[in-house]
Structure formats: C-alpha cells, structure tokens
Amino acid sequence: MVKGKWKRKIYFAGGKVLSKVNKWIPKDKKKILIFCKGPLCDNSETLFHYLVKHGYQKEYKIVCVVDQPERYEEFQEENVKFITLKSSLGSIFTAKYNFFHGEMLAIKPTKKQIWVNYWHGTPLKKINHMLHKLGEYDYDFFTYLTAAV
C-alpha cells in the first residue's frame, strides 16, 4: 500500500483514470492472472500449482505477475507465462479472472471481471471502511474477498 497522504491521493487518482480505461478494454474469458508482485509464494503458489495440476492451462491462459520471471522457467509451458510488474497492466485489464495476494491495486474491476483478494491476514476493518482516520478513500477493489476464520 502507498504510504503518505499526497502519494495516496495521486495513486488513487491514477487508479480512477485506469479504472475508466479498464471498462473499454475487451476481456479474455479464458485468461487467469495471479498477481504476486514479489515471488510466487503462499496462496499464489498454491493456486498456481492447483491450476496446473488440474490442467487449467489446457483451456485457460495463466499469467503470473512476479518480480523475477526468469526464476520460473521450469514452470513455463503452453498457456503459462510469468511476467514482471512493469509489463502487467495489459494482462490486468484483459484477464477475466484476477487473483491478488498481498497487494491492492487502485484499479477497479469491471462487471465483466472477477477479482479475488485472498490475502492471509486480510485487513477487513480497513477494507470495510471501519477505520475513519484513513480518509475519504474507496477501498472496494475486489469482486470477492476471502478471510480465514
């Protein structure tokens, strides 16, 4: 998350613009994006291996956003690719299914996209507007939100 009042204002203002752009870009119903930003680990790693083990890559394109794509060459096969954060915007816009672990983008999904937040330790109070000191920000950036019980 972006630290600092003015940085956060700029971040969310940019997100509003990109959210409007996102509405106009066609979605690929056969594309799954796993957004990690750092290494493929925890929930993202588990989801990735589950999808590959069960053959989802035969029907869907699976794109993983990681910090060092070259570390995952052994997992690359047809319809599976690893990309950097810098090259991820197009895939974020076009994927119907986006899974986020440990990061919240200021871009909102369209009605034609499903975005899942599957952090462990999800900050539910912040996301559900229960912490008023955060200001007038809209934190509803996911279609679904998971939480451990």
Task: Outline where the language-model segments fall.
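Membrane-proximal basic amphipathic "stem/tether" segments
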Residues: M1-I32, C36
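Active-site and donor-binding regions of nucleotide-sugar-utilizing enzymes
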Residues: L33-V149
